[in-house]
């Protein structure tokens, strides 16, 4: 029996999760919602994906464009077992009451507060805590990136300080910036540290800057160690950590541009780089401090987490079976 999945919000994250669902042998994509008949809605229809209006109030937009929808969100909820809410930050919390009324499980994204769901989720760190849950929150792209690597060395961590160098906007976003400035988050810690703590219990402080780029985030991470660890040990740990890849400057990976080109060379859909990219040369231990630099593809690293969250909520597989199935279906390298 396949779990029937709906996607509320077919944008940057929603369309990637929708694609990922179609790659699973234990899930079925029932439909997606849009607020307007834009190119993404037309493309979904071309792909044979039923498109629903996100609400009754949006129906005139589709009618005026001659775009036939399969119904509204309410209709979609009658047909699914779980809805993946990929709406803009803050909307998910408002939508929760609708999902509760429909008796449908829901997955929220990192733009929502942790209190929106029963558990905040990163598969490799706390898969078991989502087993059988009705409401799960996949943490943000940045938080997912931090947890992927920090959970791998968690037993060594005394304290973490991470600087988040955030992209200003997604590639298709014309509304956000800056385009000629560096914008600091003047409140310390930034929200990322407390968000990490909703998944793994570590001491962490973060600060953040927004810079004029669209393709990836970069994190500069310093870990104070509570027991000895050498750089070669960290390399071994990361090499054996799922959804983390090591890249070398000597092989031409000098910036985020080459990392995205690597994803393109893999012929990944939307040049997705699901894995967290760690620069191997940046891994260094000085005294009791570990340093490393990593990059996060903000459009895609949370996608496999959404798939694993579905399996956990329906208790369809154990942690490593789910991760293996998801990785294999999406071409994740390890």
UniProtKB/Swiss-Prot annotation:
It comes from the Archaea. It catalyses: D-glyceraldehyde 3-phosphate + phosphate + NADP(+) = (2R)-3-phospho-glyceroyl phosphate + NADPH + H(+); D-glyceraldehyde 3-phosphate + phosphate + NAD(+) = (2R)-3-phospho-glyceroyl phosphate + NADH + H(+). GO terms for molecular function: 4-hydroxy-tetrahydrodipicolinate reductase; glyceraldehyde-3-phosphate dehydrogenase (NAD+) (phosphorylating) activity; glyceraldehyde-3-phosphate dehydrogenase (NADP+) (phosphorylating) activity; NAD binding; NADP binding. SUPFAM superfamilies: Glyceraldehyde-3-phosphate dehydrogenase-like, C-terminal domain, NAD(P)-binding Rossmann-fold domains. Keywords: Cytoplasm, Glycolysis, NAD, NADP, Oxidoreductase. NAD(+) binds at residues 12-13, 111, 167, 298. Its EC number is 1.2.1.59. InterPro entries: DapB_N, GlycerAld/Erythrose_P_DH, GlycerAld_3-P_DH_AS, GlycerAld_3-P_DH_cat, GlycerAld_3-P_DH_NAD(P)-bd, Glyceraldehyde-3-P_DH_2_arc, NAD(P)-bd_dom_sf. The active site is at 141 (nucleophile). SMART domains: Gp_dh_N (SM00846). The keyword Cytoplasm applies. It is found in: Cytoplasm. D-glyceraldehyde 3-phosphate binds at residues 140-142, 192-193. Pathway: Carbohydrate degradation; glycolysis; pyruvate from D-glyceraldehyde 3-phosphate: step 1/5. Pfam families: DapB_N (PF01113), Gp_dh_C (PF02800). GO terms for biological process: glycolytic process; lysine biosynthetic process via diaminopimelate. Homotetramer. Belongs to the glyceraldehyde-3-phosphate dehydrogenase family. This is Glyceraldehyde-3-phosphate dehydrogenase. It comes from Thermococcus onnurineus (strain NA1).
